[in-house]
Amino acid sequence: MKILILCTGNSCRSQMAQGFLQSFDRRLDVYSAGTEPATKINQMAVEVMKKAGVDISHNKPKNADQYLNEEWDYVITVCDHANEVCPVFPGKVRNRLHMGFEDPSEAKGNYTEIINEFYRIRNDIRDEFYSLYESEIKKKIY
């Protein structure tokens, strides 16, 4: 099963979602990309994912355009901006979903307050994607 997860920068939310989905089931072929990719992955995202036992430290932000002509079982946007500007995929997309999450990189405050926001969003992403995996994706794996 081939899944593409999109956000704006592909530096945080979509990377976390990709990491979690792959950790749920290694049979899944999961990619992530951004509509306006950042230059590097957010290090706080790497840190909170490592605490969850998922290593995303070697991931790099990618542009959604490189995936436009491919076929996908799922294309999932994880931020409102990506949902609004999500490109039309000329390739076949069987299921298009939007699962909006706040951007933890916009958190304000001291280090503890900011990292706690990253943990909160990480947990939301984990829980929502696990629910999607259990209720829908797992049943369709071929």
Protein language model regions, located:
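Cytosolic catalytic domains that perform sulfur/thiol-centered chemistry
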Residues: 1-3, 67-78, 118
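Conserved active-site segments centered on acidic
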Residues: 1-67
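Conserved small-residue
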Residues: 10, 49, 75-76, 125
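Short glycine-/acidic-enriched loop or helix-start segments at secondary-structure transitions
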Residues: 15-17, 42, 85-88, 108
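Residues at the C-termini of beta-strands that transition into short coil/loop
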Residues: 34, 79, 100-102
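Residue-level detector of flexible, active-site-proximal loop/helix-junction positions
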Residues: 37, 82, 103-105
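Mid-chain, well-packed structural core segment of small domains
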Residues: 70-91, 98
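Phosphate-binding/catalytic loops
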Residues: 86-142
